[in-house]
Amino acid sequence: MRRSFYHYLMTLKGPAKDSETDFANEAAKDIQFPKQTEDYHELSSYLEMNADYLSNMDIFDELWEKYLENNK
């Protein structure tokens, strides 16, 4: 069974101060984050419209690629 992007993202939470960890920490606080989806477009649209904590969509794109590689 494939895990959702959110589940993958939660593995990156922690005290480190880098863009990926910051994204994971902030997404964990976002009660409306689409937690069950594996759909790039649904996540991308949500983040563009609702996630003021994500300063750059390139961060999401890079993590999406890592998610796909780790979720085969």
Curated annotation (Swiss-Prot):
Pfam families: YozE_SAM_like. Disulfide bonds: none annotated. It comes from the Bacteria. InterPro entries: UPF0346 (IPR010673), YozE_SAM-like (IPR023089), YozE_SAM-like_sf (IPR036806). Belongs to the UPF0346 family. HAMAP family: UPF0346 (MF_01538). NCBIfam families: PRK13672.1. This is UPF0346 protein EF_1680. It comes from Enterococcus faecalis (strain ATCC 700802 / V583). The lineage of its organism: Bacteria, Bacillati, Bacillota, Bacilli, Lactobacillales.
